Swiss-Prot record:
Chief site of localization: cytoplasm
Identification of the protein by name: Ribosomal RNA large subunit methyltransferase E
List of catalytic residues: K183 (proton acceptor)
Function of the molecule: Specifically methylates the uridine in position 2552 of 23S rRNA at the 2'-O position of the ribose in the fully assembled 50S ribosomal subunit.
Recorded catalytic activity of this chain's protein: uridine(2552) in 23S rRNA + S-adenosyl-L-methionine = 2'-O-methyluridine(2552) in 23S rRNA + S-adenosyl-L-homocysteine + H(+)
GO cellular component: cytoplasm
Native source organism of the sequence: Rickettsia akari (strain Hartford)
Class of the enzyme per the UniProt entry, highest EC level: transferase
Protein family membership: Belongs to the class I-like SAM-binding methyltransferase superfamily. RNA methyltransferase RlmE family.
Length: 227
């Protein structure tokens, strides 16, 4: 994958102020309009700029191969599931080469993806995923993040809690030598979780894709080869 964005960079777009638009929503809109990865995703058919983050993770660590079972937590709008579907060459009629995606928000169908419109934190959701998975997973991936508050310490802790929940679930469903990928925000409180992950996986890395905004504290935890 190339990160050459020369064909996707537009002139800076200014956003007119509006009485109905908050400062934060105006800033978000300005970032979207001037983000080359947003433009690239639109042109290349990906549902979100987050697709390029997973592509970069794969380019770095080579985790995805055909004939895999993958669980995608917090999947909407489907960018990561799209990428995974392409990388494992998923199809709608394969039992051993499939992706199970979970989110409260609906996503449009993707080849080889079985979507569950559920709250991951509801009591029966894990049981349902395990039932649909019908065996052990090769990869559990989570791009879940809490709604940001603008307070970095709060956002850090909230997203870390989501990562911890995803990690505990991954331990239940991953096969030996399976992999776990999850978003966290840097902030200092992640060290305890990292130590737990290192006890369960042979290799644990931090990775910040170039497609992650430079001002963001997000990084990705990449845990390789479950013990």
């Amino acid at each position: 994958m190339t990160n050459n964005l020369s064909g996707y960079r537009n002139k800076f777009v200014r956003v007119k102020t509006s009485k109905k638009r908050t400062v934060s929503s105006g800033n978000w809109l300005r970032r979207q309009l001037n983000d080359p990865y947003v433009a690239k995703a639109r042109i290349e058919g990906f549902r979100s700029r987050a697709a390029y983050k997973l592509l970069e993770i794969h380019e770095k660590f080579k985790l995805f191969t055909p004939n895999m079972k993958i669980v995608d937590l917090g999947a909407a709008p489907g960018g990561w599931s799209q990428v995974a579907s392409k990388l494992i060459k998923a199809s709608d009629n394969s039992l051993n080469n499939k992706i199970i995606s979970i989110d409260l928000l609906e996503i449009e169908p993707i080849i080889g993806v079985e979507f569950l419109q559920k709250d991951f934190f509801e009591e029966n959701t894990e049981e349902l995923i395990i039932q649909v998975l019908d065996g052990k997973a090769d990869i559990v991936m989570s791009d879940m993040a809490s709604n940001t508050t603008g307070h970095k310490a709060t956002d850090h802790i909230r997203t870390l809690l989501l990562c911890e929940q995803a990690f505990e679930f991954a331990l239940k469903v991953l096969k030996p030598s399976g992999h776990f990928i999850a978003k966290i925000f840097r902030g200092g409180a992640e060290n305890e979780l990292l130590n737990k992950v290192k006890c369960e996986f042979k290799t644990v890395k931090h990775f910040k894709p170039s497609s992650s905004r430079s001002e963001s504290t997000e990084i990705y935890l990449v845990a390789i080869n479950k013990k």
